[in-house]
Amino acid sequence: MKMNKVAMAVAFTAALSSMSVLAADTTTGKIEFQGELVNTACGLAPNSSPVIVDFGQVPVSALAGGNHAGNVHKNIELQHCDTTVATTAVVTYNPTSVNPTDATLAAFTSGTASGAGIGLRDSASQDVVWGQATTAVQLVNGTNTIPFVAYLKEESAGATVTAGSFQSTVNFEIAYQ
């Protein structure tokens, strides 16, 4: 009987010991830091470069008659703004390639779609003219957003718009005043 108690005690101790050995395993990982210190009135929020505009699937017929289609509302988000440095911001947009038929549109730079392009409206709902500053946006201390609307449009009245995928890039520069 005494031997049974000793055997049980040894077995119990062994079981607890193996559990503590199992609990001693660790999980490892790492934290990576990145960013950029800038000498401007505001910094870009991490989700604002690049800003991804996904039009999804837009029927070719939606562009008929010069209609704007897609109309995706997006924001350029600014953070840590300091109004003692500047009180307004203007944005200048420049596509990597301007549509050769309609200079108000960004050209599709890859993909199989053709006959249309991408346009933007600024925070004041004005059509963006590439290379020219937009209407000024009033800044507040802290976080600010600069809204814009991206749209698709046929490149000329009655243009043959070919269905397919497309990509394009428009760069932007923010000037503070």
Where are these regions (language model features)?
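Mature extracellular/passenger domains of Gram-negative fimbrial/pilin and adhesin proteins
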Residues: 2-6, 21-177
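Bacterial N-terminal signal peptides
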Residues: 9-17
